[in-house]
Curated annotation (Swiss-Prot):
The lineage of its organism: Eukaryota, Metazoa, Ecdysozoa, Arthropoda, Chelicerata. Keywords: Disulfide bond, Knottin, Neurotoxin, Secreted, Signal, Toxin. Insect active toxin causing rapid but reversible paralysis in crickets. No activity shown in mammals. Does not show effect on mammalian voltage-gated calcium channels. GO terms for molecular function: toxin activity. The keyword Signal applies. The presence of a 'disulfide through disulfide knot' structurally defines this protein as a knottin. This is U2-agatoxin-Ao1e. Residues 21-34 form a propeptide.
Length: 69
């Protein structure tokens, strides 16, 4: 019984998080990231993918993370 209640609560939380950003707004944000440059403190890829805006460089912070700084 506890497992069923836990699954229902987790499902409700996931659904509320997904619905927090409307689909159209999410698509606009995604398109802006794909086409434009990345602002400060956004994750980047030094070898491929979106580039940092002018004046910023893609700095490797760890093996798994690089940010525009």
């Amino acid at each position: 019984m506890r497992a069923i209640i836990s699954v229902l609560l987790i499902s409700a939380m996931v659904f509320s998080i997904i619905e927090a950003v409307p689909l159209e707004e999410g698509l606009q944000l995604f398109e802006a990231e794909r086409v434009g440059c990345l602002p400060r403190n956004r994750f980047c890829n030094a070898l491929s993918g979106p580039r940092c805006c002018s004046g910023l460089r893609c700095k490797e912070l760890s093996i798994w993370a690089s940010k525009c700084l």
